[in-house]
Curated annotation (Swiss-Prot):
Gene: king-tubby
Keyword Cytoplasm: yes
Domain of life: Eukaryota
Keywords in alphabetical order: Cytoplasm, Nucleus
UniProt source species: Anopheles gambiae
GO biological process: protein localization to cilium
Listed name of the protein: Protein king tubby
Length: 447
């Protein structure tokens, strides 16, 4: 079964990360004229002042060495490799990493980068925190992306990450910066890594702050009598030194005509009656359309159920090989960064109804970023900037058509049951987690 799964992931329909270097096995240090510059020892020391692999949040950028590996096969050249100086922290303050965190932290520590946009006309903000300067967002068909006046995507300086693919030779060259997240506004300041503010129950439903990147991890638990068919998914917010904070858990209901996931802040009680119940994800019969609702009830006039997202997967009845195509609909944002309340309880007023009738005034439409075919690997590739390490049909990045370099969300596999999930404004943790769960669910008309 494991060999079959590995063979399936190697099919052309899988989406691979384009920023991974090709690893070729070598039986000796020097053979056939090869010369490898490396140090003999484990690839991750314990946290100590002499740890060459340690990455501190405030580490300055060191000199720019160049490492070249010669021989047959494609050439891979890395420049601007950062070196970490002696840690200013003492050994007593460092947390001892577990083997599992050591294996996955190095490849998942680089945040998502975005590319610069053309200069936009500045307009002062009337709302938002701290009187921040807002920029006029580009429009599509006369409609703004987030609101009447929303901040433009982060802009990068000349030293930030860019990725190029040479289609003629297949050689891939990557030039990376120190791993600092890109700016969340027009001032050039880098994105800060987000953390939980306030109670978990409230934070998971609040839209992400502008200029903040939230890096999360989803684990799938398939242990137990019935978890092979009904696994439990856990969402954790990643922190420094391999630490993580539990945020949400989700599981498919057993007795339901369609796929129906209960999402809760309490991992021990995944039911609608639980105090930690946040909302649910429900699909249609064919598994092509998924609806994300909050914790409200359908027939409650005082607190009606709100539509938080709709995920639409393009049908693939003929079975063509290739990545999935998906459309995500979100409620629009006001000038004070709050969601517009949209409810499908009212006839023809839900997110899907507005999208079908082309009434997009209060709706944000996102699409998955189109992967690029790589002739060398014979697969579709996307640049996940080190956050995704395994090919999977589930890997995707969400962008808006007017700003395709501002990655609102990305999701991908790093192990058999471990996935990374990063999201930004205007998504919240609950919306992003529900969108990721829709990728796990089986789709009769999409595979």
């Amino acid at each position: 079964m494991e060999a079959y799964i590995r063979q399936k992931r190697a099919t052309p329909g899988m989406v691979q990360a384009s920023d991974l270097q090709l690893v070729r096995p070598m039986s000796g240090v020097n053979r056939n004229g090869r010369e490898v510059h490396a140090y003999d020892g484990p690839m991750q020391f314990m946290m100590s002042p002499t740890n060459p692999d340690q990455i501190m949040p405030t580490s300055p950028v060191g000199p720019v060495p160049t490492v070249a590996v010669g021989g047959t096969g494609p050439n891979v050249t890395a420049t601007s490799i950062t070196t970490t100086p002696t840690s200013p922290y003492s050994d007593s303050t460092m947390e001892k990493l577990t083997p599992s965190s050591q294996d996955s932290e190095d490849e998942e520590s680089t945040p998502v980068d975005v590319l610069p946009l053309p200069a936009s006309t500045k307009s002062p903000a009337n709302g938002g925190a701290g009187g921040a300067i807002l920029y006029d967002r580009p429009t599509v068909d006369g409609h703004h992306l987030l609101s009447h006046s929303a901040p433009i995507s982060p802009a990068l300086n000349n030293n930030n990450h860019t990725h190029h693919t040479n289609s003629s030779s297949g050689n891939v060259k990557s030039s990376e910066d120190s791993g600092t997240p890109p700016s969340g506004g027009g001032g050039g300041a880098p994105d800060t890594e987000g953390d939980v503010i306030g109670p978990i129950e409230q934070w998971v439903t609040q839209p992400a702050a502008q200029g903040v990147l939230y890096k999360c991890r989803i684990t799938r638990d398939r242990k137990g009598m019935d978890r092979g068919l009904f696994p439990i998914y856990y969402l954790h917010l990643e922190r420094d030194y391999g630490k993580k904070l539990f945020c949400l858990a989700g599981r498919k209901r057993k007795k339901s005509k369609t796929s129906n996931y209960i999402i809760s802040c309490d991992p021990t009680d995944l039911s609608r009656q639980a105090d930690g119940f946040v909302g649910k994800l429900r699909s249609n019969v064919f598994g092509t359309t998924f609806f994300v609702y909050d914790s409200g009830t359908k027939n409650d006039a005082a607190a009606p159920r709100l539509d938080l997202a709709v995920v639409i997967y393009d049908t693939n009845i003929l079975g063509f090989k290739g990545p999935r195509n998906m459309t995500v609909l979100l409620p629009g944002m006001t000038e004070d960064d709050q969601r517009v309340q949209i409810s499908s309880v009212d006839d023809q007023q839900g997110l899907l109804d507005c999208w079908k009738s082309k009434n997009m005034d209060n709706v944000v439409e996102l699409h998955n970023k189109t992967p690029i075919w790589n002739d060398e690997t014979q697969s579709y590739v996307l640049n996940f900037h080190g956050r995704v390490t395994q090919a999977s049909v589930k890997n995707f990045q969400l962008v808006h058509d007017s700003d395709p370099e501002y990655i609102v969300m990305q999701f991908g596999r790093t192990a058999d049951d471990i996935f990374t999930m990063d999201f930004r404004y205007p998504l919240c943790a609950f919306q992003a987690f529900a969108i990721a769960l829709s990728s796990f669910d089986g789709k009769l008309a999409c595979e």
